């Protein structure tokens, strides 16, 4: 039924074509000189202009990717420094599928900013931030990106009490300009937050507030000035320290803006004794505490009453083995937010160990390694607060809520046909039992085809996927088959992409498609995401050696393929190491990381590293007055490429280290650890964490530690340290890996097509030799006619086979690409449907895509008048649902966008399709259906 429905829906809107007619063949070239008339494809994504209430509803429940891109040592950030799991698409999908639709990505930029080069931001660092943003955008989740620990209580460079505040503003502007330009073409799902918890050293609240407001104005002006979608983007700005009382009781004003009603207020909320104090004295959340919280959040009405939405960027509580109390607290927070135009983002710090003490500063909800919830009942409490109706004073809530599980429900439909770019609002109905307080969640099998959250289905790319609604408590589930077809548009779209790209592992480039329609936009697909990934913006990221094919598909169906070859990265079997000194110098207000001259290591052996203050200290350290190895958090040896942001982790799978000799200013120290230990952290980074460490202990006797500050005993103002060490058991990634069987390349292949007479076609590649081990990637040149399902296939007994789903009468060229250079082509003609399929036409109507308006980017900042007139033309949402807008018990609900909702019956008065059946032209009339809210 899935294939029949999608097929006939498409046929019902297709123009009549003679049987056997084939679409014109499109050449794929590397932008040869004969590409006349082709222009760079628009990278600016369609942007929906939503009201504050619509944004809050779509953003749903929020979650922080905490201790990840914000983790740092001496303001040198690293993704796995404060937690050990590298963020993946699966991590983000797990967050989404557990009910969250907003991810806040705190980012520390720190030493990734080159003060000596116009404040240039390290490209690999911002590229990694972009990758994680793309993982979220792929699910159509909202994403918040900020400047985080750079302004940490006067220890970073973003110091609001600086005597040279103009220089701070200059650097702040330069950094935000680069971030904004990098993301300027992203759609409405990306939000920028100006800063994190910024405050001065004293208690001069209004002085601090004035400085914060000054920076907020620089932020807004800078982002808006980069143009494209940044001219309309939602931005978020805090008051002093993101404190609710400071922000509401002192003179805090939002910055002036060139576009109206596009600013969030950012605040944080933690209850100090219950949520942050590292002891088990305060573990209970009470009704009195709830009343106090309601009163504190009521202060935010100063802004929400004016239509200004609020983001609670962080909230949460340490795990003190008090799950029921934390659940009560989280439900209260989200109930208050749900009734007050507020989005709440839970602080998840990503690291937990249930064997440790309960006060070990654990906020974790999601196990990022296993991709599963750690505390599902806490997530359930968050979502109950967000989606179940109740009084704003939370008087109906209490500790130990008993869940009445959903036992059954129905989807509003089983199948859906929708054009690329369209949005459809579905719902569940007939929920049993009626008194349930369970929640219905949503997920998609393939977000590249269609995404979903809270019943909102967005068509992203041609193909078929399954949308599943399921109850949170016991997993009662129902599914809908969604077929996405090409949107109606120009018939003569041309498309050109590079034939081949060659990359090194860990590098990236962009597809940079060219087209004769500047308003066309594209989706991208990689044949092998282990080798190459590709984002919604066409960013191609090389991950490991191999060959992959990237298909670029226009929203109207035209597609082209790029072969991507990923080769060895230079220096694959060597690593660069350096001594690092992490200062914790309150006397000079210097809290940063310094490093010495690196050495290159390629195997086991004995090596020596040095740090010389006169030669190795940076200009910033010298300017601050630092001139010796004093007042430190740690001295340690680390992978220098990781320190510089050139690598996320080390190229090693194993390595042990033993300290042989440590000399400070000519004095040899007494080493207490005489056995080898692992030099790798659990994150895979070569980082010894010692021999000097004021937190975890040092490997020498001549160190004194006070308040986590380390100094050398009896050595006055030491200038140099020399560390001699032995490495053993060193193993590089990929070393010694050999295939059990030698790969057998495809020498030649030919294709054949078999009509399965059910709206699908089998495409079969016959290869020589028959024992070839390469996989084959199949692509359709015009996916509006037919698209390949599961396009990558292995060779078995000399054949590889895939399935093509037909969408309309016409023709398309199918090309098969081997991992080597072998290719083959065949024309697939869709001429009609069988009599048995014709009855499927009554299943439903097509949900059409909205008109696309992608203007050319401009460096000119739009005036307020331009913003008002132009902001109504980007992608407008047209939605449809059979279900009543009234929420059912336990169901995630959201109000329809004002003036943007059309029922199928009202939107499609009549559809006439012309198909060929046994050589006879048959006209199928699809009559409009009445909505269930309409009297029949």
What are these regions (language model features)?
Residues 29-102:
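N-terminal carbohydrate-binding accessory modules
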Residues 615-653, 696-711, 718-722:
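Extracellular beta-strand ligand-recognition surfaces/modules
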Residues 403-570, 738-857, 895-906:
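Extracytoplasmic soluble-region selector
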């Amino acid at each position: 039924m899935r294939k029949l429905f999608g097929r006939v829906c498409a046929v019902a809107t297709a123009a009549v074509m003679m049987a056997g007619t084939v679409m014109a063949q499109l050449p794929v070239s590397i932008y040869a000189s004969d590409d006349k008339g082709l222009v760079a494809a628009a990278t600016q994504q369609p942007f929906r202009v939503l009201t504050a209430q619509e944004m809050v509803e779509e953003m749903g429940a929020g979650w922080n990717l905490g201790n990840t891109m914000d983790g740092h040592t001496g303001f040198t950030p690293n993704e796995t420094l404060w937690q050990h799991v590298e963020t993946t698409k699966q991590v983000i999908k797990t967050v989404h599928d557990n009910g969250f639709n907003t991810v806040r990505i705190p980012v520390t930029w720190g030493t990734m900013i080159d003060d000596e080069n116009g404040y240039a931001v390290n490209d690999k660092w911002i590229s990694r931030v972009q990758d994680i943003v793309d993982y979220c955008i792929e699910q159509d989740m909202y994403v918040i990106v900020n400047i985080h620990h750079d302004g940490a209580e006067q220890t970073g460079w973003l110091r609001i009490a600086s005597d040279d505040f103009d220089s701070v503003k200059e650097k702040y502007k330069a950094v935000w300009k680069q971030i904004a330009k990098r993301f300027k073409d992203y759609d409405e799902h990306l939000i920028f937050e100006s800063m994190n918890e910024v405050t001065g050293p004293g208690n001069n609240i209004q002085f601090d507030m004035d400085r914060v407001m000054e920076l907020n104005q620089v932020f807004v002006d800078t982002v808006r000035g980069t143009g494209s979608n940044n001219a309309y983007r939602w931005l978020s700005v805090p008051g002093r320290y993101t404190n609710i009382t400071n922000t509401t009781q002192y003179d805090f004003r939002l910055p002036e803006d060139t576009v109206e009603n596009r600013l969030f207020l950012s605040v944080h909320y933690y209850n100090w004794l219950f949520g942050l104090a590292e002891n088990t004295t305060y573990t209970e959340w009470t009704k009195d505490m709830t009343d106090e919280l309601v009163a504190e959040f009521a202060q935010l009405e100063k802004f929400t009453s004016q239509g200004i939405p609020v983001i609670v960027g962080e909230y949460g509580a340490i795990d003190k083995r008090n799950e029921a109390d934390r659940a009560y607290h989280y439900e209260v927070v989200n109930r208050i937010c749900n009734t007050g135009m507020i989005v709440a983002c839970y602080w998840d710090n990503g690291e937990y160990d249930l064997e440790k003490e309960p006060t070990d500063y654990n906020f974790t909800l999601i196990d990022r390694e296993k991709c599963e919830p750690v505390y599902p009942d806490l997530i359930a409490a968050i979502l109950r607060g967000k989606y179940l109706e109740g009084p704003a004073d939370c008087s109906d809530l209490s500790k130990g809520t008993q869940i009445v599980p959903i036992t059954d429900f129905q989807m509003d439909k089983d199948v859906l046909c929708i054009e690329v770019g369209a949005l459809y609002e579905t719902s569940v109905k007939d929920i049993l039992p009626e008194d349930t307080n369970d929640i219905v969640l949503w997920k998609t099998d393939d977000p590249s085809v269609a995404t979903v959250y809270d019943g909102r289905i967005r068509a992203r790319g041609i193909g078929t996927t399954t949308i599943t609604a399921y109850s949170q408590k016991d997993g009662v589930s129902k599914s809908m088959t969604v077929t996405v077809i090409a949107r109606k548009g120009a018939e003569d779209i041309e498309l050109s992409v590079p034939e081949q790209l060659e990359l090194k592992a860990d590098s990236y480039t962009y597809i940079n498609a060219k087209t004769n329609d500047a308003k066309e936009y594209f989706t991208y697909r990689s044949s092998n995401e282990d080798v190459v990934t590709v984002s919604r913006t066409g960013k191609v990221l090389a991950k490991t050696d191999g060959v992959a094919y990237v298909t670029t598909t226009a929203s109207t169906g035209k597609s082209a393929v790029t072969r991507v070859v990923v080769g060895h990265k230079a220096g694959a079997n060597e690593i660069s190491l350096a001594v690092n000194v992490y200062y914790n110098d309150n006397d000079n207000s210097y809290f940063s990381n310094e490093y010495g001259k690196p050495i290159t290591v390629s195997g086991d052996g004995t090596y020596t590293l040095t740090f010389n203050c006169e030669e190795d200290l940076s200009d910033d350290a010298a300017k601050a007055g630092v001139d010796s190895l004093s007042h430190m958090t740690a001295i340690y040896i680390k992978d220098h490429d990781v320190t510089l942001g050139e690598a996320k982790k080390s190229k090693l799978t194993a390595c042990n280290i033993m300290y042989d000799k440590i000399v400070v200013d000519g004095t040899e120290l007494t080493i207490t650890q005489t056995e080898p230990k692992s030099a790798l952290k659990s994150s895979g980074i070569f980082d010894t964490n010692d021999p000097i460490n004021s937190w975890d202990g040092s490997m020498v006797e001549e160190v004194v530690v006070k308040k986590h500050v380390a100094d050398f005993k009896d050595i006055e103002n030491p200038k140099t340290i020399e560390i001699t060490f032995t490495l053993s058991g060193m193993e590089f990634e990929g070393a010694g890996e050999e295939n059990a069987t030698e790969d057998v390349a495809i020498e030649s292949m030919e294709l054949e097509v078999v009509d399965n007479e059910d709206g699908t076609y089998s495409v079969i590649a016959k290869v020589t030799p028959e024992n070839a081990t390469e996989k084959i990637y199949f692509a359709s040149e015009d996916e509006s006619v037919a698209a390949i399902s599961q396009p990558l296939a292995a060779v078995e007994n000399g054949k590889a086979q895939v399935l093509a789903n037909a969408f309309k009468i016409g023709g398309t060229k199918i090309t098969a690409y081997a991992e080597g250079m072998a290719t083959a082509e065949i024309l697939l003609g869709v001429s009609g449907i069988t009599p048995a399929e014709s009855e499927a036409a009554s299943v439903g109507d097509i949900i059409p895509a909205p008109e696309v308006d992608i203007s050319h980017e401009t460096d000119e900042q739009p005036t307020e008048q331009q913003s008002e007139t132009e902001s109504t033309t980007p992608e407008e949402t047209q939605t449809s649902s059979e279900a009543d807008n009234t929420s059912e018990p336990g169901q995630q609900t959201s109000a329809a966008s004002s003036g943007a909702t059309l029922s199928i019956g009202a939107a499609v008065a009549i559809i006439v399709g012309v198909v060929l059946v046994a050589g006879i032209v048959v006209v199928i009339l699809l009559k409009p259906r009445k909505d269930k809210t309409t009297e029949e």
